[in-house]
Amino acid sequence: MNLIILKRHFSQHASLCLTPSISSSAPTKQSRILELCKLGQLTEAIRILNSTHSSEIPATPKLYASLLQTCNKVFSFIHGIQFHAHVVKSGLETDRNVGNSLLSLYFKLGPGMRETRRVFDGRFVKDAISWTSMMSGYVTGKEHVKALEVFVEMVSFGLDANEFTLSSAVKACSELGEVRLGRCFHGVVITHGFEWNHFISSTLAYLYGVNREPVDARRVFDEMPEPDVICWTAVLSAFSKNDLYEEALGLFYAMHRGKGLVPDGSTFGTVLTACGNLRRLKQGKEIHGKLITNGIGSNVVVESSLLDMYGKCGSVREARQVFNGMSKKNSVSWSALLGGYCQNGEHEKAIEIFREMEEKDLYCFGTVLKACAGLAAVRLGKEIHGQYVRRGCFGNVIVESALIDLYGKSGCIDSASRVYSKMSIRNMITWNAMLSALAQNGRGEEAVSFFNDMVKKGIKPDYISFIAILTACGHTGMVDEGRNYFVLMAKSYGIKPGTEHYSCMIDLLGRAGLFEEAENLLERAECRNDASLWGVLLGPCAANADASRVAERIAKRMMELEPKYHMSYVLLSNMYKAIGRHGDALNIRKLMVRRGVAKTVGQSWIDAH
């Protein structure tokens, strides 16, 4: 901002302080003001300034730089603006230290990066600190492209990059997913000899970690001389972000036991995530103990990671104990507890927690809607949908995908379609939720059309997509289409069929009366010893008098795999009765008694809507 604009902008503030009144001992007073600035006592410094005539205390760059830095330190932006006005009036805006102090003030306390940029574009001489501050400000404000533009601008002015500007540039590349450009900056780092710098090496490890290049992240780490805790945490995080949880745990123990380094809160949070995703409750408890030993147990971020770990490991009671012991709770900790109950099928409890929450973030809405879907509680789901709308929250892909899932599972396919059609942003979860909704509600042809449209738009179907489309084919008797999709998933998309896909195919073939084809398909599968899959086929076989021999084979196979599973005995006994083999039916019942097989009483519930 040039001098005229600055004077116009700050004229209203210039008279708010430094009111002149004659006094003495100016040099002593200036020294006292500088001393007060060091101590962060801004109010007292201003009092002395206001009691002194302006001619007695010269307007020096050192004085104004100190005052501006103190404003920054004590979070007083209004006084900072007033001093900014006096800087302009005194003609000190060209001084480098004053300019950098102003830049720091606006970056930390100002209304936005636009105003900070105006200060940066002022008349002061920029140095490495100025350019670094500007880049860091843009990165912090998630304006990553602008951060890189500042880097280019800096180089065009003939200034050389330092480790801080390079670190900001690499961080910007990380968030933009620009791995190739990040590699170029990595080359510049090596050219300048900064590869030994822990700070920039950690940033490089982060670049590769968040962009699915964990091998390169490890390579950067291995080249670090005596990596510190931040470096170890960076590569731990890289492994964790790429689902390499075993490697992350191994690295943690190497750091803690082998190198004797004391992990910080970020390290513990990362390794607890690994334990949770691996369902390693014993190791999670061990790390919980280390947290307490190291005095980090009361950190709200770490405690939220503990909640998440216990929830994923199925230990909701211990998660609740951690939560109850927290001195401070934030939306993350509430969300972690809510997610723990939901993941473990305690949907009613999850809904209770949601109602207790004072501050609800969007993640909580997504989680509680999953709980509603698990209970088929569409009426409550609609109530939560209403809360979401009343908050003016539109366009959240997680919440709106959860709404589609809820409405689909509750039979409200039209509501699911309306939510889907209004979404401005969709991801893979959204596509799969809508595809599943169509499949579960008998809209097989629409599901096939939707799937084909998805592929045409360049959306690559995943594991879940094929479960949904095979379910759709099964529910509407589209046998040929189902066979084609089953082959397509491995041949064209490299997706190895899992238990769920075989279950869909067996159900499809069983509904069509193709029992022997289903039996042969299952015999060739790697999951052929999964009794639940044979159970899928046994139901339709046992209900078909012409398939009694196949049903008999399957039931006996199930009895071998799971001798205590009651349904194989019950279905076979019922089939024998249906075809007049009452003696065989009685023998099966006696076999149940000898083996101590108890029949489980079924239960169900509905939600009226």
Curated annotation (Swiss-Prot):
SUPFAM superfamilies: TPR-like (SSF48452). One of its GO terms (molecular function) is RNA binding. The keyword Ion transport does not apply. GO terms for biological process: RNA modification. Pfam families: E_motif (PF20431), PPR (PF01535), PPR_2 (PF13041). Transmembrane segments: none annotated. Keywords: Repeat. Signal peptide: none annotated. PROSITE patterns: PPR (PS51375). InterPro entries: E_motif, Pentatricopeptide_rpt, PPR_At4g14850-like_plant, TPR-like_helical_dom_sf. PPR repeats lie at residues 25-59, 60-94, 95-126, 127-161, 162-196, 197-227, 228-263, 264-298, 299-329, 330-364, 396-426, 427-461, 462-497, 498-532. Residues 533-609 are annotated as: Type E motif. Belongs to the PPR family. PCMP-E subfamily. This is Pentatricopeptide repeat-containing protein At1g03540. The gene is PCMP-E4.
